[in-house]
């Protein structure tokens, strides 16, 4: 799917007659799409009176063939990119994990899909970041077996979090 395809789909929401609150664009995306969707979201809200927030999935960090461009370079570039978006209704998920599907298969996936489910479950005034077990927003180790990629540690997570990305983290002492 191209950026143009995504923007054409969002453009159809101008005439969509049902209520909606958020748009989740599934699949890796980069700054050009984030910027275009930021403008489209502002137009939907201001002109068409359809406020919504947009959830996107960042590109999985990989090393270049020469071994350069590791996770810290990727995180620094992500921080730079986020500064170019002046829209609090655009959220980019920069977290991946190995998840166990309902049929028992494991898959490496961006965790925005899990977040979408938590948003649907949560009352509007409640944060999905609650960590109390009775809050019901955590993910069990049986469902989310590990955070990825390798090297996705607290320093990288903190950099991305401060920059405004949606991140996941594990807390020492907090178990299933």
Name each model feature, range by range.
Residues 2-176:
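A glycine- and small-residue-enriched flexible loop/hinge signal that marks low-structured segments
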């Amino acid at each position: 799917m191209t950026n143009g395809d995504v923007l054409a789909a969002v453009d159809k929401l101008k005439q969509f007659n049902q209520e909606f609150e958020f748009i989740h664009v599934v699949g890796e995306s980069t700054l050009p799409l984030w910027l275009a969707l930021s403008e489209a979201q502002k137009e939907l809200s201001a002109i068409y009176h359809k406020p919504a927030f947009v959830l996107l999935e960042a590109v999985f960090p990989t090393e270049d063939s020469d071994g350069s461009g590791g996770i810290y370079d990727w995180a620094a570039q992500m921080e730079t990119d986020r500064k170019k978006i002046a829209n609090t209704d655009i959220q980019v998920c920069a977290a991946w994990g190995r998840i166990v599907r309902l049929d028992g298969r494991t898959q490496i996936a961006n965790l925005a899909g899990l977040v979408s489910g938590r948003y649907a479950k949560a009352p509007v005034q409640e944060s999905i970041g609650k960590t109390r077990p009775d809050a019901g927003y955590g993910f069990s180790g049986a469902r989310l077996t590990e955070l990825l990629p390798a090297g996705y540690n607290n320093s990288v997570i903190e950099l991305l979090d401060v920059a405004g990305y949606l991140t996941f983290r594990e807390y020492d002492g907090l178990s299933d």
